């Protein structure tokens, strides 16, 4: 619910529908239980019945207000993410839900009129007012017809659930409950050690069977709200990537290629012709390479769909199985393999940033590793990029002044492999990662300070997949702790 409420208007609208529907459903179940009770155990009487009736009236107001609000957003609203995916099915679904609510009111109005408007029914203020307004000549017939229509519309609603977007009523909560808890949010899915594999038939995802069951459940859980697309920086800058379309297209391939084929949640413009369960019949490589892997889509999704995981898995297939990647990436891959950094700079220049410091920066090795509390992980940008080198110098200077004992790996430090992994080249990532892990484990490194957020995430959240378990702290965290310790003194 917290994610839903990030968009305040849409969040309030959904909350009204959700709370109203649950209230009315609970009220209906309670009424049926009451009817099944023997006379001595009936409980909807006196004050209890008045509170019950009044509560259901409030639930009805919330439910219908939310539904009419949702209908207005589609009819007269201008929000792009809503307008582009509004279909006839949406109007029919909302109309059905509104009819269920209104037929419930008319059923109640007929019953109250049939009982000749007793005073205690004034607490059912909507049904009471509607009954008086209609001035029914045959309240019994009106009540029966309204009740039958109400029941029929509810059964139509039940039938529509698996055939429409309404399925998310069930699939979304299940999907949220089944979201992986053990894997850190910043970590990519581990697919095994490729360097130790004897035979590799496939890496990444190309066909529906390559996706995990949880990734496929994501497809059915999608509410097509478009929040992911609205926060996607690639989409906002005119790139071809549309995170919502990625989910819908893979969902369509899954639905149409399954046995038997079932309707997809929502279709994209134009007829769907799928000749196989290959997702690249619907998704282009340009869409996938436009992704910056920022994870904004995952963070904003109200039902915990992991969109980035699917994009990265498809990238893995393109990069390693098809060699289908931008030329610029090919150069970076070669540089990372040959020079251990994306720019092809010499490893001998890893310590060049220390040359004009007024103190020595020690390099850790087998003979001195016990003298230092922290390994300072400089990173490729921190060592080679002209804009980042001043940051490296400043961090080292502050650590020295604070009395923190630290050392660096120097030429032994190689790229963490984050760029390779995020762009699909799992093989290069694992080569670099295992080299770093073996070096640090041999030096018995336990605590690491990083300044690059990419290095922080990779070492802290992804190196454990390959046997690298360290206490990793970002320089901003450590410096904050040091400042706070001085304040407390």
Task: Show which residues each predicted segment covers.
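Short acidic (Asp/Glu) and glycine-rich catalytic loops that position anionic groups and cofactors
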Residues: 152-153, 225-229, 291-295, 311
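Charged, low-complexity surface segments at secondary-structure and domain boundaries
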Residues: 155-156, 232-235, 298-299, 318
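Membrane-embedded alpha-helical bundles of multi-pass integral membrane proteins
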Residues: 1-205, 248, 253
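Short hydrophobic/aromatic-enriched beta-strand-loop microsegments
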Residues: 468-475
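Iron-sulfur-cluster electron-transfer modules
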Residues: 1-69, 76, 210-219, 241-245, ...
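Conserved small/polar residues in nucleotide/adenosyl-binding loops
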Residues: 487-489
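A general structural motif
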Residues: 477-485
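Ferredoxin-type iron-sulfur electron-transfer modules and their immediate structural context
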Residues: 158-291, 339
């Amino acid at each position: 619910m917290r994610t839903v409420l990030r968009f305040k208007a849409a969040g309030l609208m959904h909350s009204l529908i959700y709370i109203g529907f649950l209230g009315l459903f609970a009220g209906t179940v309670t009424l049926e239980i009451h009817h099944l009770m023997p006379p001595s155990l009936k409980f909807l009487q006196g004050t209890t019945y008045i509170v019950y009736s009044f509560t259901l009236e409030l639930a009805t107001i919330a439910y219908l207000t939310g539904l009419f609000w949702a209908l207005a957003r589609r009819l007269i609203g201008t929000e792009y993410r809503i307008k582009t995916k509004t279909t006839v099915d949406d109007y029919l679904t909302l109309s059905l839900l509104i009819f269920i609510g209104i037929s419930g009111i008319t059923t109640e109005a007929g019953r109250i009129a049939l009982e000749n408007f007793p005073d205690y029914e004034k607490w059912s203020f909507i049904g009471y007012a509607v009954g008086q307004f209609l001035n029914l000549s045959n309240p019994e017939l009106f009540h029966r017809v309204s009740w039958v229509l109400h029941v029929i519309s509810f059964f139509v609603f039940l039938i529509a659930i698996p055939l429409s977007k309404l399925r998310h009523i069930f699939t979304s909560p299940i999907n949220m409950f089944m979201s992986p808890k053990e894997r850190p949010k910043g970590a990519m899915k581990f697919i095994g050690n490729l360097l130790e594999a004897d035979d590799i038939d496939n890496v990444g995802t190309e066909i529906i069977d390559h996706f995990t069951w949880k990734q496929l459940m994501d497809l059915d859980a999608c509410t097509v709200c478009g929040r992911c697309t609205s926060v996607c920086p690639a989409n906002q800058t005119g790139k071809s990537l549309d995170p919502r379309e990625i989910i819908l297209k893979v969902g369509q391939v899954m639905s149409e290629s399954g046995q038997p084929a079932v309707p997809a949640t929502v279709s994209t413009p134009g007829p769907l012709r799928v000749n196989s369960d290959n997702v690249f019949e619907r998704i282009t490589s340009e869409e996938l390479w436009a992704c910056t892997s920022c994870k904004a889509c995952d963070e904003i999704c109200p039902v915990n769909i992991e969109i980035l995981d699917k994009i990265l898995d498809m990238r893995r297939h393109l990069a390693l199985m098809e060699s289908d990647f931008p030329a610029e990436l090919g150069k970076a891959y070669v540089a990372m393999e040959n020079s251990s950094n994306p720019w092809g700079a010499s490893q001998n220049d890893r310590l060049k940033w220390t040359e004009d410091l007024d103190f020595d920066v020690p390099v850790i090795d087998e003979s001195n590793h016990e003298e230092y509390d922290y390994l300072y992980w400089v990173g490729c940008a921190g060592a080679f990029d002209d804009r980042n080198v001043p940051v490296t110098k400043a961090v080292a200077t502050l650590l020295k002044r604070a009395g923190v004992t630290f050392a660096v790996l120097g030429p032994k430090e190689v790229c963490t492999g984050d760029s390779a992994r995020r762009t699909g080249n799992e093989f290069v990532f694992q080569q670099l990662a295992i080299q770093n892990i073996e070096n640090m484990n041999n030096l018995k490194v336990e605590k690491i300070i990083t300044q690059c957020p990419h290095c922080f995430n990779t070492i802290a959240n992804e190196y454990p997949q390959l046997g690298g378990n360290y206490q990793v702290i970002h320089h901003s965290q450590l410096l904050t702790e040091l400042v706070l310790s001085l304040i407390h003194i």
